[in-house]
Amino acid sequence: MPMQGAQKRLLGSLNSTPTATPNLGLAANHTGAPCLEVSIPDGLFLSLGLVSLVENVLVVAAIAKNRNLHSPMYCFICCLALSDLLVSSSNMLETAVILLLEAGALATRASVVQQLQNTIDVLTCSSMLCSLCFLGAIAVDRHVSIFYALRYHSIMTLARARRAIAAIWVASVLSSTLFIAYCDHAXVLLCLVVFFLAMLVLMAVLYVHMLARACQHAQGITRLHQRQPPAHQGFGFRGAATLTILLGIFFLCWGPFFLHLTLVVLCPQHLTCSCIFKNFKVFLTLIICSTIIDPLIYAFRSQELRRTLKELLLCSW
């Protein structure tokens, strides 16, 4: 029936497995074990998506307007904003369609709903993969700018950045299409989990390496000017705190989603895992929160971008 197809959450194959879903309620009744399920109101979900949408549209518009921001680093930031924009808009679209179908305001055939769901699935999955890839690309770009400062402009040329961006988008779309087509295979889910862990390790290694170099540089300046050691220690603490926040937000926002995928493979019928599966929308909400935080970390800290954004907003008035 159309409503049955419409009520499936986007990436429904990740939310639960065909064998485990029908028995969740019965298993809980037999054991009497309470199952914690956090309910995310659709209004809150849509509001967070709208905030993310506005933020990332502003980032893309500001970078597109200012030619001084057409550098490899800002190209990666722009693509991160674009992929985050697609993550939030695709989830908003899915939620809006489900609400309209449930309210009877949108009537359509089951085949049309299924095609729409498959399209949104591919869009959501590819945009998530792109977001992870561009977070890694930004880390690589910053690492090159610090450790190869004199050769940075010859290494990170605009042409190479564009080729890397094109490769990321094409690879993400193709891999997400394969993922949706073979989402019932455990190997596909494990590949996604391994990819997330690889991005996490890559970012951690690069940023820790950059922090170590920054601390060495600060220590050298301290010795040169014969200042007290606590100044260097304070810089190290601030850098460590910044690094902890950056990686912590990444892990907290994306980790639960990929933990969910891991549990789908390892324990699809276990009662505890089934309880976790019920909180799938919470994990999507955390990813939406990540798309809200990304512009604050990577884009709005730039004085040039903030100035361009201010000009855009003033011109619009």
From Swiss-Prot:
One GO term (biological process): adenylate cyclase-activating G protein-coupled receptor signaling pathway
Domain of life: Eukaryota
Extracellular topological segments: 1-37, 94-118, 184-191, 267-279
Membrane topology of the entry: Multi-pass membrane protein
Annotated localization: Cell membrane
GO molecular function annotations of the record: melanocyte-stimulating hormone receptor activity
Cytoplasmic topological intervals: 64-72, 141-163, 212-240, 301-317
Gene3D superfamilies referenced in this protein's UniProt entry, alphabetically: Rhodopsin 7-helix transmembrane proteins (1.20.1070.10)
Primary location class: membrane
Keyword Lipoprotein set for record: yes
Role, per record: Receptor for MSH (alpha, beta and gamma) and ACTH. The activity of this receptor is mediated by G proteins which activate adenylate cyclase. Mediates melanogenesis, the production of eumelanin (black/brown) and phaeomelanin (red/yellow), via regulation of cAMP signaling in melanocytes.
Subunit record text: Interacts with MGRN1, but does not undergo MGRN1-mediated ubiquitination; this interaction competes with GNAS-binding and thus inhibits agonist-induced cAMP production. Interacts with OPN3; the interaction results in a decrease in MC1R-mediated cAMP signaling and ultimately a decrease in melanin production in melanocytes.
The name this protein goes by in its record: Melanocyte-stimulating hormone receptor
Origin species: Ateles paniscus (Black spider monkey)
